[in-house]
């Protein structure tokens, strides 16, 4: 059986787009632009003084802390302002000494009757620091 073309319809849609460009000519006004330039902040780096002790005669220098912590500040807050809150830690897992100003961590010394504790796996092994 052969089918016929009955019932088939075709629709053609035509769209016309008109663009109008308006150009306004105005006299340039006396406008000024003020730019304030700021000196770049120097990169932070560790510098050793002449009285810094050699780290285990290895030719390396040692600081009192393994990392430098910068407290987050709000935009526009001066970096020279200091608060009492600077005793917070940096929350780095590798930081053994913590960030307590003028305080040493107090750990009880093992007594002869107390068996030695296994090392904490979250702390680095004792020895020279490797970064």
From Swiss-Prot:
Which Pfam families does the UniProt record give? PPI_Ypi1
User: Reaction catalysed by this chain?
Assistant: S-ubiquitinyl-[E2 ubiquitin-conjugating enzyme]-L-cysteine + [acceptor protein]-L-lysine = [E2 ubiquitin-conjugating enzyme]-L-cysteine + N(6)-ubiquitinyl-[acceptor protein]-L-lysine
Q: Which domain of life is it from?
A: Eukaryota
Among the GO molecular function terms of this UniProt record, one is: protein phosphatase inhibitor activity
Q: Which UniProt keywords apply?
A: Acetylation, Phosphoprotein, Protein phosphatase inhibitor, Transferase, Ubl conjugation, Ubl conjugation pathway
Its quaternary organisation is:
Interacts with TLR2 and UBE2D2.
- Tell me what this protein is called: E3 ubiquitin-protein ligase PPP1R11
């Amino acid at each position: 059986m052969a089918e016929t073309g009955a019932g088939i319809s075709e629709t053609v849609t035509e769209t016309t787009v008109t663009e109008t460009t308006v150009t306004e000519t105005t006299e340039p006004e006396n406008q000024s632009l003020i730019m304030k330039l700021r000196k770049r902040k120097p990169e932070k780096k560790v510098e050793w003084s002449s009285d810094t002790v050699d780290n285990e005669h290895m030719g390396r220098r040692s600081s009192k802390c393994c990392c430098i912590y910068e407290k987050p500040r709000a935009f526009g807050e001066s970096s020279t302002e200091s608060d009492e809150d600077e005793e917070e830690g940096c929350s780095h897992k590798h930081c053994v000494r913590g960030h307590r100003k003028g305080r040493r961590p107090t750990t009880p010394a093992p007594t002869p009757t107390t068996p030695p504790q296994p090392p904490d796996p979250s702390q680095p092994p004792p020895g020279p620091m490797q970064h």
